[in-house]
C-alpha cells in the first residue's frame, strides 16, 4: 500500500483541534496514528493531556481510517459523527507532555445504515494506557442528518 497523504489532508480539524500528527500504519480494517501531548495545548493540565481527551484521539484515528480507505479508492471521505464511547478505561489521569502516544482504531463492525464501532487503544512506550469501544455513525446524507438534529 502506498503511504497516505499528510494528516491535514485527511482530517478537517484545524488549529488546536487537530490532535493527531500522522498516520503510522493502516489497512482496510484499521488505522494507527500518533499524537504528542503538549503543555501549550488548550487541554493542558498538570503538565500534560487529561486522559479523558483520549476519546477524541481515538475519534480522530477513526476519522483518519475512514478518510484513508476512501482516499485509497479515489473517493471523498464520508462525514460522520461520534455517538459515544463504551468502557473507556485509562490507566493514568494524564498523558505526559512530549511523550508520543500511538492510537490504534480497528473496525469491529459496520452496517449499511452507517452505524459502526471501532475498538481503540492508546499506547505509550509500548504499554497500553487507554482503551474503549467507540460508536460512530456515517449518515447517508450528512447535511440532512445535521439539519434534522436542529429541530
Q: Where in the sequence are the language-model features?
A:
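Conserved positions in beta-strands of structured domains
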Residues: 21-24, 91, 106-108, 135
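Hydrophobic beta-strand-centered segment that forms part of the acyl-chain substrate-binding groove
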Residues: 65-104
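Compact, glycine-rich, soluble single-domain proteins
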Residues: 46-65, 79-82
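Catalytic strand-loop segment that frames the active site of acyl-thioester-processing enzymes
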Residues: 14-50
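Hydrophobic residues on conserved beta-strands that form the core of alpha/beta folds
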Residues: 20-21, 83-85, 117, 129-131
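Short Pro/Gly-enriched beta-strand edge/turn motifs at strand-loop
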Residues: 1-7, 101-103
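HotDog/MaoC-like acyl-thioester-processing domains
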Residues: 96-102, 106-151
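Short coil-to-beta-strand transition motifs
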Residues: 13-19, 96-101
Amino acid at each position: 500500500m502506498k503511504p497516505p497523504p499528510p494528516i491535514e489532508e485527511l482530517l478537517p480539524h484545524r488549529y488546536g483541534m487537530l490532535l493527531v500528527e500522522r498516520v503510522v500504519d493502516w489497512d482496510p480494517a484499521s488505522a494507527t496514528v500518533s499524537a504528542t501531548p503538549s503543555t501549550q495545548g488548550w487541554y493542558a493540565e498538570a503538565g500534560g493531556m487529561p486522559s479523558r481527551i483520549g476519546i477524541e484521539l481515538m475519534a480522530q484515528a477513526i476519522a483518519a481510517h475512514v478518510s484513508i480507505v476512501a482516499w485509497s479508492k479515489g473517493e471523498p471521505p464520508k462525514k460522520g459523527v461520534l455517538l459515544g464511547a463504551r468502557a473507556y478505561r485509562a490507566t493514568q489521569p494524564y498523558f505526559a507532555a512530549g511523550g508520543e502516544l500511538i492510537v490504534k482504531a480497528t473496525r469491529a463492525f459496520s452496517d449499511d445504515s452507517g452505524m459502526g464501532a471501532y475498538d481503540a487503544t492508546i499506547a505509550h512506550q509500548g504499554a497500553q494506557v487507554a482503551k474503549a469501544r467507540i460508536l460512530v455513525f456515517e449518515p447517508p446524507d450528512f447535511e440532512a442528518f445535521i439539519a434534522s438534529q436542529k429541530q
